[in-house]
């Protein structure tokens, strides 16, 4: 679903919810959770704001949460406090008897939207002409169901930031080259970690429909889709240099959605799960600058007062689309559910379900 479809289908929050106090909203949500019991499963992504995160029955990254939903067979209603592609993945992995709901349909992902299926299919045709049948498509799970389905149809798979290295290794056993969607930075950082030189990577620009490289085509092994996370691109080498000068004893850990320059200048890089576990296990008194979403950084700081934890970018703000899920929309979604209304149900189109699930399963079987 692109941003225009979202705006057309999204329903406006009734004014009454903005007039309610935080206490009133929290109490109503608790009442719904108590009444529905195990029929309701509320999932909270790590980047959610605390006012919503507090109500989650399970927390984690996008794939973890989708897998949890699939295992919770008693849950008829799954309220996904995350963004659209995450709810789609949950819908793919759960049964037809389970309904996945997104409290605010405007909670999308700009990076996922950067890989439009029509642009991707045109790019694939062009790349096949350029390279022949030598390319395997891989997509980050932070992508639409349509892109996952595209990869499934063409022998490819999904990857997460945790298993990207393992999946790229697998991809190169299948084909000579790979197309990595939609985040160029995760693709570049992972390929570089595997020992592939930057010169062997090219960027496909979907706007100009051109391959951006100054190298001979036969030297290209990785084709990176020109997409990025608007949050993680805001971390720069200048932020790192400033900390090195002013806080030399502070460790810097970043997410691999950051640019390559940031990743190689940081002390460590890894998935959201890796960042959380690294800081949790760190010695008391250690100092950390974290290059990832602000809600998570603040939560880590609050949960570990014995350590100094700050954002790598001091002017960072939370992910705007993730922040669309607020306590008012959550309460409204549950009120509607109590009346038998499925507000903003997320359902992957039938034509995409099989191949998208195949792309996910290829990953789950190997990583």
From Swiss-Prot:
An example GO CC term for this entry is: cytosol
**UniProt keyword annotation of Zinc present:** no
Q: Which InterPro entries does the annotation name?
A: NadA (IPR003473), NadA_sf (IPR036094), Quinolinate_synth_A_type3 (IPR023515)
Q: Which cofactor does it need?
A: [4Fe-4S] cluster
Q: Which E.C. number(s) belong to this protein?
A: 2.5.1.72
Q: Where does [4Fe-4S] cluster bind?
A: 109, 229, 319
Q: List the disulfide bonds.
A: none
Q: Which NCBIfam families match?
A: nadA, PRK09375.2-1, PRK09375.2-4
What this protein is called in its record is Quinolinate synthase
Q: Which organism is it from?
A: Halalkalibacterium halodurans (strain ATCC BAA-125 / DSM 18197 / FERM 7344 / JCM 9153 / C-125)
């Amino acid at each position: 679903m692109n941003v225009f479809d979202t705006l057309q289908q999204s329903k406006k929050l009734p004014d009454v919810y903005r007039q309610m106090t935080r206490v009133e909203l929290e109490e109503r949500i608790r009442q719904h959770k108590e009444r529905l019991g195990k029929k309701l499963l509320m999932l909270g992504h790590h980047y959610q704001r605390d006012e919503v995160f507090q109500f989650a029955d399970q927390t984690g990254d996008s794939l973890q949460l989708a897998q949890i939903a699939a295992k919770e067979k008693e849950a008829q209603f799954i309220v996904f406090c995350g963004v659209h592609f995450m709810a789609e993945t949950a819908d793919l992995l759960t049964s037809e008897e389970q309904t996945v709901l997104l409290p605010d349909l405007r909670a999308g992902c700009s990076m996922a939207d950067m890989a439009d299926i029509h642009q991707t299919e045109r790019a694939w045709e062009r790349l096949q002409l350029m390279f022949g049948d030598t390319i395997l498509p891989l997509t980050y799970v932070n992508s639409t169901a349509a892109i996952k389905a595209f990869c499934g149809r063409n022998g490819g798979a999904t990857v997460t930031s945790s298993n990207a290295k393992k999946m790229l290794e697998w991809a190169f056993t299948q084909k000579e080259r790979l197309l990595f969607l939609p985040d160029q930075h995760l693709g570049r950082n992972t390929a570089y970690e595997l020992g592939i030189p930057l010169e062997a990577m090219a960027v496909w620009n979907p706007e100009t429909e051109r391959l951006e490289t100054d190298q001979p085509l036969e030297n290209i092994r990785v084709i990176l889709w020109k997409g990025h996370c608007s949050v993680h691109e805001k971390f720069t080498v200048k932020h790192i240099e400033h900390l090195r000068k002013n806080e030399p004893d502070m460790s810097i850990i970043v997410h691999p959605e950051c640019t390559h320059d940031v990743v190689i200048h940081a002390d460590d890089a890894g998935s959201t799960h890796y960042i959380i576990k690294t800081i949790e296990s760190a010695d008391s008194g250690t100092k950390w600058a974290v290059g990832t979403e602000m809600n998570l950084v603040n939560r880590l700081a609050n949960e570990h007062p014995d350590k100094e934890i700050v954002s790598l970018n001091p002017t960072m703000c939370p992910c705007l689309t993730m922040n669309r899920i607020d306590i008012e929309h959550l309460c409204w979604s549950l009120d509607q559910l109590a009346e038998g209304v499925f507000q903003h149900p997320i359902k992957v189109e039938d034509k995409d379900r099989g191949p998208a699930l195949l792309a996910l399963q290829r990953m789950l079987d190997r990583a």
